[in-house]
Amino acid sequence: MGRKWNNIKDKKASKDANTSRIYAKFGREIYVAAKQGEPDPESNQALRVVLERAKTYNVPRTIIDRAVEKAKGGSEENYDELRYEGFGPNGAMVIVDTLTNNVNRTAADVRAAFSKNSGNMGVNGSVAYMFDATAVIGLEGKTSDEVLEILMEADVDARDILEEEDSVIVYAEPDQFHAVQSALKGAGVEEFTVAELTMLAQSDVTLPEDAQAQFEKMVDALEDLEDVQQVYHNVDLGE
């Protein structure tokens, strides 16, 4: 699959460590998930996914509780979930998922992040067909064979199970996210190193050094935007 998931997560977390930006993004996502459904994760699958992801980033309980209470309190603050697609240097493909309360601002900010870094925004569907929605679950303390056996016994399907350094990474259909976690928890797994619903490129590309530097600058500019929740791409950054 070409992605070292723990490295990617650690890089994102360290980049945001001093500003708590990642916590703010999770706070917004938790609020939206809780407001759109029940504020109880047992009956709100979208909220459960966000909370499981938040655990892997060590999001403080106070951030989570504040977002849920805000949703419970009937806040009138509304966010739209919007997806933008575009191209970076050398035609690299990028998907940007946002939560925004000002569509015009977000569209302008995303377009500027692309255009200022040798990229350009595309139309809906211009790159998404080259990505697959995927659940990615990572854990330690088991081998890939052991994980396969656990999932088979629980009658849970996975697309792929790979070993990455000290972790095992499970790739599955998005609707299998909770089933994979439940099966593993039932087998004694208490913590997950990765818990993501992502858009996974069907094939990765490698960029020349100068183009990769420009591409990473563009991704950083996109991730720095307040309204941007996730940036997906098809570039192998060698992480």
From Swiss-Prot:
This is Probable transcriptional regulatory protein BC_0539. The keyword Transcription applies. One of its GO terms (biological process) is regulation of DNA-templated transcription. Keywords: Cytoplasm, DNA-binding, Transcription, Transcription regulation. One of its GO terms (cellular component) is cytosol. Belongs to the TACO1 family. YeeN subfamily. It comes from Bacillus cereus (strain ATCC 14579 / DSM 31 / CCUG 7414 / JCM 2152 / NBRC 15305 / NCIMB 9373 / NCTC 2599 / NRRL B-3711). One of its GO terms (molecular function) is DNA binding. It is found in: Cytoplasm. Its main location: cytoplasm.
